[in-house]
Amino acid sequence: MKFFASCAKGLEYLLADELLALGASKATATISGVNVEGALRDAQRAVLWSRLASRVLWPLTEFDCPDEDALYAGVAELPWHEHLSTGHTLSVDAHVSGTAITHARYAAQRIKDAVVDTIRRQGLERPSVDVESPDLRLNLSLRKGRATISVDLGGGPLHRRGWRMAQNEAPLKENLAAAVLLRAGWPRAYADGGGLLDPMCGSGTLLIEGALMAADVAPGLQRYGSDIPSRWRGFDRDSWQQLVTEARERDSVGRAALKQVIHGSDMDPHAIRAAKENAQVAGVAEAIWFGVREVGDLQTRPQATGVVVCNPPYDERLAADAALYRKLGDTLQRVVPQWRASLLCGNAELAYATGLRAGKKYQLFNGAIECALIVCDPIAVPRRTPLAAPTALSEGAQMVANRLRKNLQKFKKWRAREGIECFRVYDADLPEYSAAIDVYQQADGDRRIFLHVQEYAAPATIPEADVRRRLGELLAAAREVFEVPAERVALKSRERGKGGSKYGRFEQRNEIVNVREHGALLRVNLFDYLDTGLFLDHRPLRGTMAQQSKGRRFLNLFCYTGVASVQAAVAGASATTSVDLSGTYLQWCADNLALNGQAGSKHKLVQADALAWLEAERAHFDVIFCDPPTFSNSARAEDFDIQREHVRLLRAAVARLAPGGVLYFSNNFRRFKLDEEAVSEFAQCEEISPRTIDPDFERHARIHRAWRLTA
């Protein structure tokens, strides 16, 4: 069975690792959460033990939902008397996006109406609503016309541990605090005899969470006590009681062995009083020393090694002070130089102000605030002088830098909402700087940023010296804005090689970077060839096909590196078939499938000419993707011209559609003209090009065209 664990953005990979450690058979990170495979007991264990999850959602039903009537009908089909006992209360949380229903509260109300009406039709007592502490809390996820109704097994946000009685201004949520501690390596440091220090501890969230983590206390134990998280009738009470009994035994042993190596201080006496009160309620007051102290007055710790965790002030209510950050960095280097630090800063500029050299940097979200988590190990490694006497950008380079920053700000909300990690940030926005810049963020390891720069061929009338100068200015601007070294910038040119060669090889680094899109890990090669293995412009279309492929058969023609196949597989396609003439691309596709745990007989790879294969094939498919090249010539197949062959190709592809199936056809030939009359003889055809262009490609929306065909 599959269920979903939600979390704050930036915690997905940590949460996936945690859930696997808790016993889930599979956990795949996606936007703001993790798709998990496991039994109900695994989900209930996550409710009790997850330090990172926001909610654990157990699905009851999933259905197409184009409008409010479909939402009501889909919910009303469930036998709600089997889920909600007579006299029990109900509440619904709703999240909607990309759908005709735009108001979450209205969607929640329609679900309540459907549940109540269904129960009343059974002749049973009408359930009442309790938004604060319901017996059954439901969750609606309505995204792009697909609705999922789930039980919130934890009964609400899991960051509420049950110990917070007092707080200072803008407290840190407990699950985000757990992420800061885990990125700092606190569990290992404690096991090795290290200490824990927070010199700006506020109401004590980081230190209390650290103490409970060290004592092996289940996060949900105090929250629920002897109660159960949900009175959903499907909740396994016996299993829950077994989990709680085991957790209490571990709690007893861990608290008894808890060492007094945790220290916190803050300049605000009111915050320290709140921290002491919270620690008392959490049962860890004896293990934590709290005191009123300025950052600069921090004293040397007796432990030779340990971890510093800190969440300095930075949001709209708590003004960020760069001087305070600098004092923090100077003090840590003086007092605990060999310790490890994990600092949650408001942004990269504030992190930089500490003067510390970050070995790793992560993007996290504290509510709606985008933060930079820097990890320094050890603290005392001097940061490289950040261009102490920096070479100022030229006027032209500064123009490019300003445009890049403007575009980043423009795309910020869209990227955060959709979880976009690879995107086009610049595409000849300034005509004299004629290039495209794509950003690729590494999905694993240090989450490094790579830039892929494609220089467009300049007109012959422009002097070569000007072309080189402008390219240098563009590269300098990009490196400064994204803070990347030259070795992480891949430069390509679309000029043809000597002798009219096709896609020439640029470097021979053989460096593979794993990136993520639509919940799938993908291998890209940014340096060695013109193309990287991932066509970013098809991102929306791939997402649509992945959603529609769940439980269905997916065919990918001219599959290239198989990205669409992989995303369909990750989304739950019952089978995928990927066809391409290139053995190199098919191996790349196989590697991508294996990277996502999707290798196996149900994912078929076929090395063949796609058109010839189609005309000989007899199997049927529910979703077909056909993205042919404009031209192709090969010693192993007939020459291919998309304008000449598209009717024949589409006829053969439509013939392979199962009843109710859909074919998505796309190509990049800018002068392409669909023979609508010929195609109408065997298919219904609708151009959907505008719907397949994301904001980062709106500047040049004709980068591809796309159609939806049905038999």
Swiss-Prot record:
Pfam families in the cross-refs: Methyltrans_SAM (PF10672), RlmL_1st (PF22020), THUMP (PF02926), UPF0020 (PF01170)
- The first-level EC class reads transferase
User: Which reaction(s) does its UniProt entry say it catalyses?
Assistant: guanosine(2445) in 23S rRNA + S-adenosyl-L-methionine = N(2)-methylguanosine(2445) in 23S rRNA + S-adenosyl-L-homocysteine + H(+); guanosine(2069) in 23S rRNA + S-adenosyl-L-methionine = N(2)-methylguanosine(2069) in 23S rRNA + S-adenosyl-L-homocysteine + H(+)
Q: What is its EC number?
A: 2.1.1.173, 2.1.1.264
InterPro entries hit by this protein? 23SrRNA_methyltr_KL (IPR017244), DNA_methylase_N6_adenine_CS (IPR002052), RlmKL-like_Mtase (IPR000241), RlmKL-like_Mtase_CS (IPR053943), RlmL_1st (IPR054170), SAM-dep_methyl-trfase (IPR019614), SAM-dependent_MTases_sf (IPR029063), THUMP_dom (IPR004114)
Which Gene3D superfamilies would you find in this protein's record? 3.30.2130.30, RNA methyltransferase domain (HRMD) like, Vaccinia Virus protein VP39
The GO terms describing molecular function are: 23S rRNA (guanine(2445)-N(2))-methyltransferase activity; RNA binding; rRNA (guanine-N2-)-methyltransferase activity; rRNA (guanine-N7-)-methyltransferase activity
Q: Which SMART domains match?
A: THUMP
Location of the protein in the cell: Cytoplasm
> Its biological function?
Specifically methylates the guanine in position 2445 (m2G2445) and the guanine in position 2069 (m7G2069) of 23S rRNA.
Q: Which family does it belong to?
A: Belongs to the methyltransferase superfamily. RlmKL family.
What is this protein called in UniProt?
A: Ribosomal RNA large subunit methyltransferase K/L
- Its gene name is rlmL
